[in-house]
């Protein structure tokens, strides 16, 4: 993802990226940290390798944050196909955008000057009750949208108590539609038809 020609990984001190199996670029598990600060970058590097830089040079506490050879091989196998994957995912996003009833739901608006990676297609429904109706109708057809952003993080134990009414409202009403390379037009038509009919 870029904004005004600049990678989003260039904003802030440290950016993170997941390589989980559900992500655009995947290794099965793992992820990456991006940092433009040399000292901080060295500190993170040592932390991911038990605090070591080689067998005898110890810098402090650390974890085993390395991905396995198998996971690295998976990433290398996916990498040459990223252009095709992005093109296919864009066509899925375009189909959803052209065929969903936006009088009864909304989706994200991509800012001008943004190059997007088509990682998710979230829809925002009027209420959690309507979301559950749509989700149940899709599930009955063996289609499984996900609630990736539920529950609102302020409701989980270690941060419980913070008042975040907007987050709570949106988290309860966001549903992410199936989005992967290879979804057929027939499957997409089935998904959009079920959603639109559920909203009648």
Identify the residue ranges that each predicted region occupies.
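Ser/Thr-centric signal marking residues that sit
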Residues: 22, 35, 184
